[in-house]
Every structure is written in structure tokens, then in C-alpha cells.
């Protein structure tokens, strides 16, 4: 606990809800611990694999960690992370893919280099993400360097058919890190716009005054 003074850790959950019902009864497909150095502003992200077999409640029930969110929402998911990983996380933030797409669009998109394998699959994920979020986008034309809008960045973070869950979590962290970098460099008007667009769509223990 002494070593964590000056740091703020937030559990970030990305859920597969298609109907904005993000409080529970939906799996947390993304589980990321976001550690913020309050003095320097440095942000470090650590993924928890959604299929990790852990104790999800105080009854000693072992199953995939993403089930904790399904059963008891963010509070039970945070309790499970604290219990299994010996942490003392108090804050959480839950989003669905529409909130992420909207935020990235406000920030002006992100630059990402696509491998040939990623490009092979991404357009089908773009189509699915447009249908599930109602946010417009278009297919990409090539592998290599690409400027991705919100839906395309979400599709990139969701890719999983061509490699491992580890690689998928790397893509998730990359999208979040690039978004955080743009947010830190943005002017007040853009930051305010992001907050106005995103906060009504997410579930969080954090207030705007905490940000």
C-alpha cells in the first residue's frame, strides 16, 4: 500500500453490450488496469485476460474472470480483481464500443499500422461494429499505415481470428494508449467535448471533478 501512494489505479471494463445495458448481465471482453502517476501524469496499462480462471466471489466460485462482471457488474468485478491479484482498486470505468468510437472520432482518429493478417479480417469487423453501434464508417483499402476513425479503431481492437488473445490485448492497449496521448495533447474544447460525448454513455465511479 505504501508503494502505491501517489498512484491512482482504475479498472477499465469494455463490455459486449449491444443495447447500452452495461450495468451487468454482459461479459467484460476488455479488462485493463490503468495506473496513473499523479505527480508525472504517466499512464501504464496492464491487461487481465478475460479467460483467466479466478475466484469471482466470496463463495470461492472459480470461473473465467469476465463472468464476474456478468454476475455482479463492475463492483463484483473489481472485488474479484482485488481478491485474486492482491490489489486495492476502488475506481472503475465501463464502456461499450459505441462510447469508444465516439471518443476517438472527437479526438480526430488514431494512426495505426495494420499487418496483412489484420487487414484481411478488419473490414468484416468494421461492418459488424457499424451495425452494432450505429456509427458510420467505411472499409479500409490496404495494410500498412492507416489513419483510423472511431469505428475502425474499435474494429482493430476487437480483432481476434488470426492470432492469440495476448495479441488482441496488445491491440486494445495500443488503441487506448494512442487515445490517451491525443487527449493529453488536446485543447480544453476538445477535452470538454470528449467528456460530454463519453460520460453519458459509460458507467463509472469517477466524477468529472476527479478527472
Functional labels for PLM-detected ranges:
Residues 1-211:
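Non-catalytic, solvent-exposed segments at the cell envelope interface
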Amino acid at each position: 500500500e505504501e508503494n502505491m501512494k501517489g498512484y491512482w489505479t482504475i479498472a477499465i471494463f469494455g463490455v459486449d453490450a449491444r443495447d447500452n445495458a452495461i450495468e451487468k448481465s454482459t461479459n467484460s471482453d476488455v479488462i485493463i488496469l490503468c495506473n496513473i502517476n499523479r505527480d508525472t501524469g504517466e499512464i501504464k496499462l496492464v491487461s487481465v485476460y478475460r479467460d483467466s480462471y479466478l475466484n469471482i466471489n466470496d463463495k470461492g466460485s472459480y470461473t473465467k474472470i469476465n463472468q464476474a462482471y456478468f454476475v455482479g457488474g463492475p463492483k463484483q468485478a473489481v472485488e474479484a480483481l482485488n481478491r485474486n491479484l492482491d490489489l486495492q482498486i476502488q475506481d472503475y470505468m465501463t464502456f461499450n464500443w459505441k462510447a469508444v468510437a465516439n471518443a476517438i472520432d472527437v479526438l480526430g482518429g488514431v494512426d495505426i499500422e495494420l499487418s496483412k493478417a489484420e487487414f484481411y479480417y478488419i473490414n468484416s469487423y468494421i461492418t459488424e461494429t457499424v451495425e452494432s453501434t450505429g456509427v458510420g464508417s467505411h472499409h479500409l483499402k490496404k495494410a500498412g499505415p492507416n489513419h483510423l476513425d472511431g469505428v475502425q479503431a474499435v474494429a482493430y481492437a476487437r480483432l481476434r481470428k488470426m492470432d492469440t488473445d495476448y495479441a488482441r490485448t496488445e491491440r486494445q492497449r495500443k488503441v487506448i494508449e494512442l487515445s490517451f496521448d491525443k487527449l493529453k495533447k488536446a485543447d480544453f474544447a476538445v477535452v470538454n467535448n470528449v467528456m460530454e460525448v463519453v460520460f453519458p454513455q459509460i458507467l463509472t465511479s469517477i466524477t468529472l471533478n476527479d478527472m
